[in-house]
C-alpha cells in the first residue's frame, strides 16, 4: 500500500515484435507486482513498489535503458476509492453492485447527501510518494510473516505469533495498529474475480479540470459500479493529458461499456479513453522484504 515504501503505475509503448521480450525485462524485477497488456498506444501497464522513491525511480530508469522504451510514470496523487469487492454467489453484473442500497444522488435522512450511500467511504486521501511507514520491529516482522497470507488454521494469530516469537496479544495489537495506519487494508479471503465471472475490466482515464478533481473524484468513487477511482498526474510532455483514473469490472464487455457511457454522460462530461485489459502479464502480491528494511 502507498503508506509503505514508494510506488507508481507506469506504462511503456512496446513494439509488437518486441512485446514479449520487453514484458520479460519488466517482469524480471521483483518490485514489479502487476503488469497488464491494454489495448492502447501505451500497451504495457505495470506497478513498481520499492523501498524508497529513489530506488523506485532508479528501477524506472533501468527499464527505460534496458527496453529502449520511454516510461510513462504516473504515481498516485489522491485516492478517492480503492476497494475491489466482488460478489461470489449471486448474479450481480458488476463489482459492488449488491452494496448499492440506494442511488448515489438520493439524499439520506435529513435531506443531506450521504457519503456512504453505497457503504462506501469516498473521501479524498492525498498520497505521499515518499511514504515509508513508521514500523516497529514487531510490525515489520509481522508484515513479512503474513505477506503471503495468514495460515489457514483454527489459530492463525497464534501460529503467526509463534513464527515471529511474540505473544498473541502483542500480535493482535500490532495488527490493529497496522490496519488503523492503512498498512493492512483488510483481512479476509482473496477472491480470483476472473474465476467468479468478472472477466471484463476497463481502466478509463479522464481529462478532468484540476479545480474539479476532488469533487468529481469523490462523487464518482461513491458509484456502485466504480471499483477504483484516483488522481494521477498529467504528463503533457509525453502527450498524456489525463488526470482521473477509474476502473469498472463486470461480467460482460457490453455491460461495462454501457456503464462507462453512463459515467461519461451523467458524471464526467470530459474527454476520456478506455483502456481494456487484454492479457495479464504478471500479477503477484506486493513483497515487503525491501519495503520494511532501511534503504532499498
Regions found by a protein language model. Give the residues of each.
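A compositional/biophysical signature of low hydrophobicity enriched in polar/charged and small residues
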Residues: 1-296
Amino acid at each position: 500500500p502507498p503508506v509503505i515504501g514508494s510506488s507508481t503505475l507506469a506504462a511503456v509503448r512496446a513494439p509488437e515484435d518486441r512485446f514479449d521480450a520487453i514484458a520479460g525485462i519488466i517482469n524480471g524485477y521483483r518490485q514489479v507486482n502487476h503488469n497488464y497488456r491494454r489495448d492502447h498506444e501505451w500497451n504495457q501497464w505495470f506497478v513498481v513498489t520499492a523501498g524508497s522513491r529513489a530506488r523506485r525511480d532508479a528501477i524506472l530508469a533501468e527499464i527505460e535503458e534496458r527496453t529502449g522504451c520511454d516510461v510513462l510514470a504516473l504515481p498516485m496523487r489522491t485516492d478517492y476509492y480503492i476497494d475491489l469487492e466482488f460478489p461470489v454467489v449471486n448474479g450481480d453484473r458488476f463489482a459492488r453492485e449488491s452494496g448499492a442500497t440506494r442511488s448515489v444522488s438520493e439524499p439520506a435522512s435529513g435531506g443531506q447527501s450521504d457519503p456512504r450511500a453505497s457503504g462506501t467511504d469516498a473521501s479524498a486521501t492525498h498520497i505521499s510518494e515518499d511514504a515509508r511507514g513508521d514500523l516497529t520491529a514487531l510490525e515489520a516482522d509481522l508484515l513479512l510473516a503474513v505477506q503471503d497470507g495468514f495460515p489457514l488454521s483454527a489459530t492463525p494469530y497464534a501460529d503467526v505469533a509463534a513464527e515471529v516469537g511474540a505473544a498473541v496479544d502483542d500480535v493482535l495489537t500490532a495488527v490493529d495498529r497496522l490496519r488503523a495506519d492503512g498498512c493492512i487494508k483488510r483481512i479476509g479471503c482473496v477472491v480470483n474475480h476472473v474465476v467468479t465471472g468478472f472477466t471484463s475490466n476497463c481502466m478509463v482515464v479522464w481529462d478532468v479540470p484540476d479545480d474539479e478533481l476532488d469533487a468529481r473524484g469523490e462523487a464518482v468513487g461513491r458509484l456502485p459500479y466504480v471499483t477504483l477511482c484516483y488522481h494521477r498526474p498529467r504528463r503533457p510532455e509525453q502527450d498524456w493529458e489525463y488526470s482521473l483514473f477509474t476502473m469498472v469490472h463486470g461480467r460482460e464487455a457490453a455491460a461495462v461499456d454501457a456503464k462507462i457511457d453512463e459515467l461519461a454522460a451523467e458524471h464526467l462530461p470530459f474527454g476520456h479513453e478506455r483502456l481494456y485489459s487484454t492479457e495479464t502479464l504478471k500479477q503477484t502480491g506486493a513483497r515487503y522484504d525491501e519495503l520494511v528494511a532501511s534503504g532499498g
